[in-house]
Amino acid sequence: MFKPVMLALVSLTAVSFSSLGAEAEGIRVKITAGDQVMTATFYDNATTRALVSRFPLTLPMEDLYGREMCYRFPDALPANETQTSGYEVGDVVYWAPRHSFVIMYEQNNERIGNLQKVGRIHSGVGIFRHTGNIDVTFEMAH
């Protein structure tokens, strides 16, 4: 009796760790704004899968509130893991109520509801402090 139960627990643990490993690796994305190139890791969720299916994708992003670059899709993307949370500089998020795809480049410590985390830019996000509205291209990194 003890061995089958232990085997079942070990199997469940292995599944959990493999899922975490896949999520931790994520999807590598190349982001280009003007002549600046950044890399990001996008998380595996429904929102990300919907976005990546459209790559390569160039979006006219608007500088909003001195903290974020934003593009509003005409139609909603799936967002089944939204939450109220803060954000970090470099986060790439989707704000479900206005179909907003957002790069957070400055911090104001606001907590935002209905936020779906999409990914994280590794470095260089500070360039958006000086670009104003700009076309940004998203594609798979090689």
What are these regions (language model features)?
Residues 1-8:
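Bacterial N-terminal signal peptides that target proteins for export
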Residues 8-16:
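Bacterial N-terminal signal peptides
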Residues 25-74, 79:
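N-terminal secretory signal peptides
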Residues 90-91:
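Loop/turn positions that initiate beta-strands
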Residues 103-119:
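Short, compositionally biased
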Residues 118-142:
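Well-ordered alpha/beta subsegment
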